[in-house]
């Protein structure tokens, strides 16, 4: 065919595609006008579809690498989008956060958009807990694309599995109905495990990618430009992701995956996003780069500048692990977390963790102190130790309250090759008076020699009661248990009962200690229970619930 005729043929094909798109838009608007109701999953994007979470919306190679411009420049050199269209990002010109991957082939570019439309439909049906039918899929992408449906569905399935960890499965062979199933172990090991429910966590990896490609900090305008490409707009509730501003500035910030802060020297004030500490802890720049590369059907080396940065990040992490605190086998890890919740006033909290490793003998101590002169406090401290030998753990929580309600919780968990576990919890709630509660659990394991100690002290200024319970077990294959209860009451009558049961059979031992306090005038109850069982497999738990109908006090 002569060159001129080829050009005319290409022009006719391009005009036909544009006419098809325009016809789809008119059909969708006509249907919406006739029905007069909110669109469903099958017609919401029939004509005015956005890219959703297709590859067209994800960050791609940066301008600095000699590729097509995709990521927004940090300041004045940013690419700008055409604002002529009011229908959404679909009709915008090429921008820094979006470049049509098949711009040289209108047919492939159209299939990419259809993939995004089908993805949004499938996610919508998943959220509604309804199966997706092949007939509705054809309505979404237009029946003209019936022959291309298998290819479009395959691409949409790959993207959904990559981003959300959801697999598209046919309910019955050749049945024409599909559903999304969560994959507990996605083939891509890049996904983050968050406490956020689906689908909020689906945006996390792409957002971290945008921040990474923008010099490890992205302005709020750049983030919204990227989200707009996905059909997510500020102030508009998204059918899949809900309220987007709350998601990125509150939920992901609260989970410590993102940092949302004011840009330095900005006037008027503007804000930016950075990786949060949890993002640095749970993923790496290389994993994010691998994610972006897979989305764009390329390799991490296609981002040379960022690939070099990701390699440096890997080296720095390896050096930090080698020089820092021990982390494997006989080397131990300790983590202390303190969480304070305050809606109206100021708190003070201090958490300390000490690790000593000498011949695989480990010690860890966590302390939390709360001081509140006038309001309500919450504090939580958690310490976890793990290796392969002997462990000791102590957790102490002192509470001081001058006038109001306090809550403190301390939890210690030990795990090693002898399968030892020790757990201590302290909860204190005071509605009318000053209380103090202390619980200690110490566990030492050396060739089936075990010791467990539980101690509870209660102090009530109105009734002046004290109760102590102590249980000690020791010596290989021979066990002794002692329980002591001491009551001191200057103003009211108290009753105390202590029971100890021992069962010994081939190193399988159980010891139980119960302490009950009954005060007719104050109505207090305290119970302590310690259980040990199975040879070389030990568990010790100490629980002390206290109920005071006058003071409403509980201590465990």
UniProtKB/Swiss-Prot annotation:
Modification sites for Phosphoserine: 325
Sequence repeat ranges per the UniProt record: 334-348, 349-363, 364-378, 379-392, 393-407, 408-421, 422-436, 437-451, 452-466, 467-480, 481-495, 496-510, 511-525, 526-539, 540-554
Location within or outside the cell: Cytoplasm
Keyword Transferase carried by entry: no
Gene3D superfamilies, alphabetized: MAGE homology domain, winged helix WH1 motif, MAGE homology domain, winged helix WH2 motif
Keywords: Cytoplasm, Phosphoprotein, Repeat, Tumor antigen
Basic residues bias: start-end ranges: 1-15, 77-87
Gene Ontology, cellular component aspect: cytoplasm
The keyword Repeat is annotated on this UniProt entry: yes
Region (Disordered): 1-110, 315-335
Name under which the protein is recorded: Melanoma-associated antigen B4
Organism of origin: Mus musculus
């Amino acid at each position: 065919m002569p060159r001129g005729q080829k050009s005319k043929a290409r022009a006719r094909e391009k005009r036909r595609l544009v006419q098809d798109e325009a016809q789809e838009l008119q059909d969708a608007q006509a249907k919406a006008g006739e029905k007069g109701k909110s669109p469903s999953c099958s017609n919401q994007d029939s004509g005015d579809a956005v890219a959703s979470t297709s590859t067209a919306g994800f960050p791609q190679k940066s301008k600095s690498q000699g590729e097509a411009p995709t990521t927004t420049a940090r300041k004045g050199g940013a690419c700008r989008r055409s604002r002529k269209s009011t229908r959404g990002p679909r009709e915008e010109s090429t921008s820094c956060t979006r470049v049509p991957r098949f711009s040289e082939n209108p047919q492939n570019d159209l299939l990419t958009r259809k993939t995004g439309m089908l993805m949004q439909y499938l996610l919508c049906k998943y959220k509604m807990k309804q199966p997706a039918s092949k007939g509705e899929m054809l309505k979404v992408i237009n029946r003209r694309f019936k022959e291309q449906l298998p290819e479009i569905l395959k691409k949409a399935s790959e993207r959904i599995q990559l981003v959300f960890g959801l697999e598209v499965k046919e309910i019955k062979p050749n049945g024409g109905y599909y559903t999304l199933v969560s994959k507990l172990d996605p083939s891509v090991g890049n996904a983050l495990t968050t406490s956020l429910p689906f689908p909020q966590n689906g945006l996390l990896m792409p957002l971290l990618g945008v921040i990474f490609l923008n010099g490890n900090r992205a302005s709020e305008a750049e983030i919204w430009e990227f989200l707009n490409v996905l059909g997510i707009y500020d102030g508009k509730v998204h059918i899949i992701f809900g309220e987007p501003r709350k998601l990125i500035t509150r939920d992901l910030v609260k989970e410590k995956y993102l940092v949302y802060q004011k840009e330095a020297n900005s006037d008027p004030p503007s804000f930016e996003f950075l990786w949060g500490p949890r993002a640095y802890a749970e993923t790496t720049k290389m994993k994010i780069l691998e994610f972006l590369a897979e989305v764009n059907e390329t390799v991490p080396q296609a981002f040379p500048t960022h690939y070099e940065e990701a390699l440096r990040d890997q080296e720095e992490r390896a050096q930090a692990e080698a020089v820092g605190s021990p982390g494997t086998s006989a080397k131990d890890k300790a983590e202390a977390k303190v969480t304070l919740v305050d809606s109206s006033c100021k708190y003070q909290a201090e958490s300390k963790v000490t690790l000593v490793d000498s011949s695989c003998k480990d010690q860890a101590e966590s302390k939390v102190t709360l001081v509140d002169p006038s309001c309500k406090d919450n504090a939580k401290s958690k310490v976890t130790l793990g290796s392969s030998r002997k462990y000791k753990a102590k957790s102490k929580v002192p509470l001081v309250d001058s006038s109001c309600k306090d809550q403190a919780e301390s939890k210690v968990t030990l795990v090693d090759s002898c399968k030892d576990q020790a757990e201590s919890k302290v909860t204190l709630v005071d509605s009318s008076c000053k209380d103090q509660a202390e619980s200690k659990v110490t566990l030492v394991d050396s060739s089936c020699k075990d010791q467990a100690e539980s101690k509870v002290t209660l102090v009530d200024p109105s009734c002046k009661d004290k109760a102590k319970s102590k249980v000690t077990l020791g010596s290989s294959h021979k066990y002794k248990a002692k329980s002591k209860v001491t009551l001191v009451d200057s103003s009211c009558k108290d009753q105390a009962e202590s029971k100890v049961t021992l069962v010994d059979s081939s190193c399988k031992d159980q010891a139980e200690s119960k302490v009950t306090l009954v005060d007719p005038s104050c109505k207090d109850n305290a119970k302590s229970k310690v259980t040990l069982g199975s040879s070389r497999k030990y568990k010790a738990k100490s629980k002390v619930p206290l109920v005071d109908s006058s003071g409403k006090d509980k201590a465990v």
